[in-house]
């Protein structure tokens, strides 16, 4: 939501900057481009004005600045000293304002896959490989999206195998410090393979969807499914620890555990 509001406000800001620069350069704003902080006439880079000067030109107090600013901000067309070059009804200053309210929510889509190893003796679980294919619409900043996915998967692995809040009968939290609250080490997070699809959303100007929770939400279910495939027993609660897996093995051997209806040897999920 905020990204689309920013985009709409920036478009207004750009239009305003081009109008002001067009008056200073005696050019049609439709013939102007902004490149590396400079407004220039398309096809004539010599006819240009820095964007910072455009910002000063839009300020009604521009003539209160120093002599250099005064020289840099003189219009080709004379104007009153207190009349900034903005369109009628616009506020002075190089600013843009807009509002955005989505017609309805957008939803990201994706697929997670994991390969795990469960030690036959200790029941320790190691995540060997993890892969994510994700579609959050148009990628505005691919590196940030990549970081969101990687960080989310790491958080999800912690929630699936390590992090657990333990309370006593009076409701007192017993593991309230990092001394006894388990979290995964970096060495316990596997290499995460990622790929991205871009299916723009038709519901907003930027065509974007969400990426914040897409890395973390599926992880527990995926790892549980992989453990089920390895052990052949139903996993119905997470996080899961080696001693819980060991007890499930004993229950399965005694015929007390819920059998898994999936054929053994299938590809881990």
Regions found by a protein language model. Give the residues of each.
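C-terminal catalytic domains of large/alpha subunits in multi-subunit enzymes
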Residues: 1-269
